């Protein structure tokens, strides 16, 4: 697995792309600016398997709609507490931004994960879910091997 990190233009949040080169698939954590994500997917000849959200503030989700337009069968993972922010500009805070339009995720189906959930990235790689409330009550962290997101 190769991990790519991109710093986004909105609030300098980070997006991570996990490329599983053998399978030709990738997973994205906290999609922001989509140009570097699409470039990374193309350069690694990978299709998007899923999107993982640490929480649902706007600066961590604003690339979601563009990704699901290109990869409609990809899965979306979020905590139950953060799921309200997918569809509420008030809860994802985009409503209060002077620079952006109110944002809503258009993908209606998502998978709620919580503490001790495990997400199979492929047959060999499993991502562990850790609840880390604080910045947002629905915050999640993801762990795989030595990597923590």
Model-derived features with residue positions:
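Active-site HxH/HxHxD metal-binding segment of metal-dependent hydrolases
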Residues: 33-123
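Catalytic core of the metallo-beta-lactamase
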Residues: 1-46, 103-149
């Amino acid at each position: 697995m190769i991990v790519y990190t991109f710093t986004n233009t909105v609030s300098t949040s980070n997006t991570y792309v996990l490329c599983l080169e053998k399978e030709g698939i990738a997973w994205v954590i906290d999609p922001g600016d989509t140009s570097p994500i699409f470039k990374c997917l193309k350069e690694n000849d990978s299709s998007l398997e899923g999107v993982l959200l640490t929480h649902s503030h706007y600066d961590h989700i604003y690339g979601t709609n563009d990704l699901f337009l290109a990869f409609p069968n990809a899965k979306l993972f979020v905590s139950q507490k953060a799921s309200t922010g997918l569809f509420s500009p008030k809860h994802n805070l985009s409503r209060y931004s002077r620079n952006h339009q109110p944002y809503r995720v258009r993908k209606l189906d998502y998978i709620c994960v919580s503490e001790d959930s495990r997400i199979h990235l492929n047959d060999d790689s499993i991502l562990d879910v850790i609840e880390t409330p604080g910045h947002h009550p629905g915050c999640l962290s993801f762990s795989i091997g030595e990597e923590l997101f």
